[in-house]
């Protein structure tokens, strides 16, 4: 090919570049300059991106092939069950039409149609959807016929986005080194400045995964074209393949992974931020090396430790029955909504400091908007409203003096609302700029997650100074790729780095127990 040198197009391009430059100047004027520390953190993250992560190309290719074959089989089964009305797991619209005519005149029709119907909050328009939430709601019903249930299960199985990550791995991996570069985005998660991913979404890899030994067995089985259902006792091919995502990331020959993650980082950070007597009681459990999940269950009157675990993970930011049920599902716990409500009530009774903290945060945000440029302190957090910054910005100042910024903050019905999206829709767009309500639970969650991100940035900086080869990091996790003979040394060094409390976080008990892996795991 050759360049298009049409003079008119070149002039148009010049006009576009001028407008683009002016727009960037206008954006820059609205933003404060990055601090030296932020510039260093960005450089550290880019150095990690430059190292990249090595993938097992053969394993990813085999998994991709098996996923394609399974989708074909699922499509054939769908065609048989629906008399040809639906022939692929990608045909959600056809599935909705088929469902309607299957159930409209049956007792199960009303509950199913309620599951697949959503109401647009702005237009109040009723729309039908067959997304993950709708499928989960349908499968929870007791009135389904075997055929309807199987169709939903097929879509739930075949619609998994996890296996698509194998394609992303293969598309982004360097053909010579099999390493994927540039995945980690510095401060990509909006207000909290947590890291995010692009291309290959590392943050939402399935937690459940196979060990290196299981992966080797499964890889050899796929290499010879084995049947995973019979030879590997797999009930769901897609579920099995999803468990290969983490172990598809591997170290170079002669190297190991050293993986360290903080134990219950948010469950420690939240009470520490509250700077309360009740919060200190929770922190004392960690300081004493006791089991927070066991003690939480005991405090609520339950013998099952898992009940304590899901309560700690789901309820710290004001979550109620919905949040608890979502966490229960993730851990395979079944309870009714009534039982979940009892757990919520008991957790809040056992942790009154949390409710006090949520309410105090919400009150501070309201006071800040009513009294601009006045600082309000809650626990270890400070709030101030700056009316001339980005349409009026509520700022949360964290213990390390970094900030969370909530732009275009307004008081509405006694509650602070701010703009949610990073980019405002076009002027001719029908979409309004989405907003969010800054109630106490959201403020607590934002501060907790932002502080965890502060800790991670500081520890990545220290790893960089110590010349430790970080190849990947997630919200509470740091992954090193080290020579096999030095693995024990790096385990001890990474533990020291992660458990050393920064001066600005004095009193926060940190715990990390790095482990050695032949492949990336959990």
Give the ranges of each region predicted by the language model:
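Conserved "right-hand" nucleotidyltransferase catalytic core of DNA-directed polymerases
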Residues: 1-241, 254, 266, 325-402
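Hydrophobic (often cysteine-bearing) scaffold residues that line and stabilize catalytic clefts
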Residues: 20, 266, 289, 293, ...
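Conserved catalytic palm subdomain of right-hand nucleotidyl-transferase polymerases, strongest
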Residues: 249-265
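Short, contiguous acidic/charged loop-to-helix segments that flank catalytic cores in large enzymes
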Residues: 154, 169-175, 187, 206-210, ...
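Conserved catalytic core of nucleic-acid polymerases
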Residues: 123, 298-468, 509, 513-522
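Flexible loop/turn segments at secondary-structure boundaries
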Residues: 96, 191-194, 203-209, 265-268, ...
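C-terminal structured "cap/appendage" subdomains that terminate the fold
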Residues: 462-513
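Active-site palm subdomain of RNA-directed nucleic acid polymerases
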Residues: 31-41, 455-478
């Amino acid at each position: 090919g050759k360049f298009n040198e049409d003079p008119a197009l070149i002039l148009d391009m010049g006009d576009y570049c001028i407008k683009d430059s002016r727009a960037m100047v206008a954006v820059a004027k609205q933003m404060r300059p990055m601090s030296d520390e932020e510039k260093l953190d960005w450089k550290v993250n880019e150095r990690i991106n430059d190292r990249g992560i090595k993938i097992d190309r053969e394993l990813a290719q085999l998994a991709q092939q098996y996923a394609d074959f399974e989708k074909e089989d699922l499509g054939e089964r769908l065609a048989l069950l629906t008399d040809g009305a639906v022939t692929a797991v990608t045909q959600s619209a056809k599935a909705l039409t088929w469902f309607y005519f299957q159930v409209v005149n049956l007792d199960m029709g009303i509950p199913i149609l309620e599951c697949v119907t959503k109401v647009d909050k702005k237009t109040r328009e009723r729309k039908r959807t067959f997304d993950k939430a709708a499928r989960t709601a349908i499968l929870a019903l007791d009135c389904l016929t075997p055929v309807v249930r199987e169709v939903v299960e097929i879509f739930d199985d075949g619609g998994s986005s996890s296996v698509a990550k194998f394609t992303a791995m293969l598309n982004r991996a360097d053909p010579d080194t099999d390493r994927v570069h540039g995945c980690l985005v510095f401060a990509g998660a909006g207000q909290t400045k947590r890291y995010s991913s692009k291309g290959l979404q590392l943050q939402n890899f399935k937690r459940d995964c196979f060990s290196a030994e299981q992966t080797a067995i499964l890889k050899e089985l796929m290499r010879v074209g084995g049947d995973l259902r019979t030879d590997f006792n797999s009930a769901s091919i897609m579920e099995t393949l999803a468990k290969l995502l983490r172990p598809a990331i591997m170290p170079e020959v002669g190297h190991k992974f050293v993986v360290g993650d903080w134990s219950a980082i948010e469950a420690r950070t939240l009470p520490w931020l509250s700077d309360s007597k009740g919060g200190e009681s929770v922190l004392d459990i960690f300081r004493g090396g006791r089991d927070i999940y066991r003690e939480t269950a005991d405090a609520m009157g339950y013998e099952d430790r898992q009940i304590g675990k899901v309560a700690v993970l789901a309820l710290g930011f004001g979550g109620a029955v919905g949040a608890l049920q979502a966490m229960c599902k993730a851990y395979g716990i079944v309870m009714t909504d009534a039982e979940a409500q009892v757990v919520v009530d008991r957790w809040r009774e056992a942790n009154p400091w949390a409710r006090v903290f949520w309410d105090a945060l919400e009150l501070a945000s309201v006071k800040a908007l009513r009294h601009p440029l006045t600082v309000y302190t809650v626990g270890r957090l400070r709030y101030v409203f700056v009316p001339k910054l980005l349409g009026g910005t509520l700022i949360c100042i964290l213990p390390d003096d970094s900030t969370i910024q909530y732009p275009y903050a307004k008081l509405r019905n006694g509650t602070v609302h701010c703009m949610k999206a990073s980019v405002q829709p076009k002027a001719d767009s029908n979409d309004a700029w989405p907003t969010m309500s800054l109630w106490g639970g959201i403020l607590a969650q934002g501060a907790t997650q932002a502080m965890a991100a502060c800790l991670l940035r500081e520890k990545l900086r220290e790893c960089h100074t110590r010349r430790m080869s970080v190849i990947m990091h997630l919200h509470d996790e740091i992954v090193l790729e080290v020579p096999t003979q030095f693995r024990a040394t790096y385990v001890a060094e990474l533990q020291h780095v992660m458990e050393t409390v920064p001066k600005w976080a004095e009193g926060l008990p940190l715990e990390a127990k790095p482990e050695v892996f032949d492949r990336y795991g959990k």
